[in-house]
Structures are given as C-alpha cells and as structure tokens.
Amino acid sequence: MTTSVCRRAPAIFVNHGAGPLPVLMPVTDPDHGTARAFLEQVTPAWLGLNDVDTRPSAIVLVTAHWEESTVAISSGASHPLLYDYGGFPKEAYALTYNAKGSPAIAHKIHALLTAQNIPSKLDPTRGWDHGLFVPMKLINPAEDIPIVQLSVVRGSDPDLHFRIGEALAPLRDENIAILGSGMSYHSFHGRGNLVAQSKAFNDALVKACAHVDVQARGEALRAWEAMPGARECHPREEHLIPLHVIAGAAGHDALTSKDILSTMFEPVRLVSMGWGVQEL
C-alpha cells in the first residue's frame, strides 16, 4: 500500500506582456519574444507541469485586469473570455482558452478570506480577461488544469493584498498553485534611461521579496512606493499589486527570480518571481 503525499504548490508572479501580443507574435519577435519565451518555457517548469508528480491540481490566478470594491472570485464551472483590449488584429478576438473553472475551490477561497475578515464575493458569470488567458495559453496550452480567477481590490492597498495572499496560502498545501499576472514595470509615459530605472526598481523589489521571514517581506513590500523609481515604473500600481498577493502566499519559502530585457514598448527590465518553484 502506498501513501499519497500532497505536494506544496508554488506561488508565482509573471509578467503577462502587452495585450494579446505574446500569443500573436513568435518567440523570435524582437519586442515580444522574451515575454513569450518566459511564459512558454520558464513558467511551466517553475509550476512543475512536465511531471505528473509535480503538476498542480488547480491554479488560482490573480489578475491585474479585474478591479472590484472587494475581492471577486470567478466561481463558474466554466467562463467565457473577455477580450478587454482594443486595436489589435482580428485574430486577437478569436483566441480561445477552454480550461474549466472550479466552484468548489472558489467557495473555499471565499471561506478562507471570510475567516480573515477580508470581504469577498463570488462571480459565476464574468469572463476571464487577458491577464488570465494570454499567459495561460502559453503556460499550459493543454487547458487541462482548472482555474479560479481573482480580482484585485480598488485602491491597491499593499497591506490588504499581502493579507489576501496570506489567507490564500493554505491552498498551496492542497497542491493548488497561486499565480499573479501583472507587470513589474507598467508605464506608458516613461522618461530617461528606462532600463536603468526599471532595473533599480526591480532590484529593490527582489530585495524586499527575498526576505524568508514573511513578516519582514510584508513590511518591505508595504513600503514599495519608497523604492527607487517606484512611481515612474508604476504611475498606477494595479499591475504591481498581484505581486503583493503572491508574496503574501509565499509563506517562509525562499525566492527564485528571473529578470529579462523587454522592448514591447520601450526597453525595460522585467522581473518574475516564484516561491516553492521547481528549479530549472
């Protein structure tokens, strides 16, 4: 008789790229290829998708592209796609991603948040936005892992979002991975040396996230606005705040980070982070 051991699934923050372009452009594209390569090659390895013994049983994905007054949780057995972008080729509006939802996990998330006095609501109808389906088409094109999508909360309070992550952390012990989809740099009006600017901010982010002690990590991330170039890199922080959720869910795990040069708008450095990941 064998005993089944439930793996502790990882917590990962990824840069989802510019709209649908990581999916539409080839990996050799000079502007979008690096983002695509990370999502297509590194993230599946971090998640352990290539081995039945390390694959997560489900994924909870926090998207920068859904903001609500309280945490909203996709609770349907399936969800349509929400093409929440404009001005792209017609192929961008024919993309599909047919992974299942999980009402059971959605209700479990609602209960975990309620236990920590964090208001939340179930949403069985809203479509999955491109913060989910663009990276997931590259991360897991097999579409065979159930997903529950979570919103961020308007106002982007760093303390609240870190606490949301802490509340979700027990899911990892049930082999449910927690994925944050945003950008470590997100500004359309950058000035000056953006590579140096984004690298300085990313380095400060990594230093904050590298704290193994979860309390120290939380304190460092709550002060993100004091990091070098913070507001230049994030005039609005909705693309950063999923990282706070993931860092809160990371517990006392050690950090793995990977930085890439992206030229999707202007040349900038982007950093993705993972805790409890499968090493390459």
Sequence positions of predicted segments:
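Solvent-exposed alpha-helices and their adjacent loops that cap or buttress functional pockets
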Residues: S4-V5, V52-D53, I139-E143, P170
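Internal, conserved structured core segments that host functional sites
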Residues: I105-F162
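Beta-strand elements within well-structured catalytic alpha/beta cores of enzymes
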Residues: P10-N15, A58-T63, L150, L171-S184, ...
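Long, well-ordered alpha-helical scaffolding segments within enzyme catalytic domains
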Residues: A37-A45, D159-E174
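Flexible, glycine/proline-enriched loop segments at strand-loop-helix junctions
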Residues: A92-K100, S151-P158, A230
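Surface-exposed, charge/polar-rich loops and edge strands
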Residues: S4, K108-A111, A115, P146, ...
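A short aromatic-anchored loop/beta-hairpin motif
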Residues: T2-Q116, S120
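Short, basic/glycine-rich phosphate-binding loops at helix/coil junctions
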Residues: F13, D84-P89, P141-V148, R222
